C-alpha cells in the first residue's frame, strides 16, 4: 500500500515517525541575559549624591554637583569644577568599604568629559587604596602634561612609582577603563576600548612588586591637583563602576 503513495507523503510520514520516536524536542536555550550589575556602581540618576555612599572633600572655590547640562547617558552626571585659578587644590568624592572581591584586584569604568583647561601638572582622577587618602597607600589614574598617568604612592615613605602614556581627550566624552592589581602590582588603562598603558609597579625591589597597597578598601573620584591650575576647568563623570572583571561600555 505504501508503494502506491506519492513520494512527498512518504517523506512526511517518515518525519512524523522520527519526531515521535525521538521524544520531546529539546527547548532552545535563551539568549544571554543583560550584563549583571557591577559590584560597585554609580550612574547619578537619582539626581543627588547618596550620603550613605559618598563623602566630599573640597578646597577653595571648587564645586561638586550632580547636573543635567552635560551627560553621557541618562539624565544626570557628576561635575567637579575648578572655577578660578588655583594652586594645589581638590574636589573629591570618597567611598569606603569596597566589596571584598575588589580588595586586591579590580576593574573600573567611567565616562569622562574634560574641558581643555585641565592643568598640565599632575592631576589625579581616581584612586583606590587604604583609608586615609592622601596619607595612605594607593594606585591612581591621573594626568600629567596632557597624558594619562598611573601611579603607586606610599605617602609614609614619600615615594612613588609612576608611568605615563596616551593623550587625554578633551572637550568630548570618552570611555575610560582601568585595572588595578595589588598581587602582583600592576595597572592598565584603556581609552575608548584601546589600551594606552599596561605596566607593573616596582618599588623597593629589583622587579615587579606585590601587595604594595595592602588592599583596596577606599576610592576617590574627582580631581586633586598637585600643582597650579592657571585657568578654570571642569571634569564630568558618568556611569562609574567597579567589578572583578573588565566591565566595558554601557549597553
Each PLM stretch: what is its role?
Residues 29-58, 238, 251:
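Extracellular carbohydrate-recognition regions
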Residues 172-188:
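Localized edge beta-strand/strand-to-loop motifs within extracellular or lumenal beta-rich domains
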Residues 42, 231-248:
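Extracellular, beta-strand-rich glycan-interacting domains
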Residues 75, 79-150, 241-250:
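Secretory/extracellular carbohydrate-interaction modules
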Residues 200-235:
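Flexible glycan-contacting loops in extracellular carbohydrate-active proteins
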Residues 10-20:
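Bacterial N-terminal signal peptides
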Residues 153-175:
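Short, aromatic/His-centered strand-loop micro-motif at the edge of beta-sheets
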Residues 48-80:
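Extracellular glycan-recognition surfaces and repeat-rich motifs
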Amino acid at each position: 500500500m505504501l508503494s502506491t503513495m506519492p513520494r512527498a507523503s512518504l517523506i512526511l510520514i517518515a518525519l512524523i515517525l522520527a519526531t515521535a520516536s525521538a521524544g520531546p524536542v529539546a527547548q532552545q536555550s535563551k539568549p544571554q541575559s543583560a550584563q549583571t550589575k557591577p559590584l560597585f556602581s554609580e550612574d547619578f540618576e537619582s539626581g543627588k549624591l547618596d550620603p550613605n555612599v559618598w563623602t566630599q572633600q573640597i578646597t577653595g572655590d571648587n564645586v561638586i554637583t550632580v547636573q543635567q547640562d552635560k551627560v553621557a547617558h541618562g539624565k544626570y552626571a557628576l561635575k567637579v569644577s575648578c572655577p578660578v585659578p588655583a594652586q594645589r587644590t581638590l574636589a573629591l568624592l570618597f567611598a569606603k568599604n569596597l566589596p571584598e572581591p575588589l580588595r586586591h584586584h579590580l576593574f573600573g569604568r567611567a565616562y569622562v568629559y574634560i574641558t581643555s583647561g585641565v592643568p598640565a601638572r599632575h592631576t589625579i582622577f581616581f584612586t583606590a587604596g587604604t583609608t586615609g587618602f592622601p596619607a595612605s597607600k594607593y594606585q591612581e589614574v591621573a594626568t600629567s602634561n596632557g597624558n594619562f598617568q598611573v601611579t603607586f604612592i606610599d605617602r609614609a615613605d614619600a615615594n612613588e612609582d609612576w608611568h605615563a602614556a596616551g593623550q587625554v581627550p578633551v572637550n568630548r566624552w570618552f570611555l575610560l577603563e582601568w585595572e588595578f592589581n595589588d598581587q602582583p602590582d600592576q595597572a592598565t588603562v584603556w581609552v575608548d576600548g584601546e589600551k594606552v598603558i599596561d605596566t607593573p609597579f616596582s618599588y623597593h625591589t629589583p622587579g615587579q612588586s606585590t601587595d604594595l597597597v595592602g588592599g583596596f578598601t577606599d576610592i576617590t573620584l574627582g580631581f586633586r591637583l598637585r600643582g597650579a591650575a592657571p585657568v578654570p576647568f571642569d571634569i564630568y563623570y558618568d556611569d562609574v563602576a567597579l567589578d572583578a572583571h573588565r566591565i566595558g561600555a554601557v549597553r
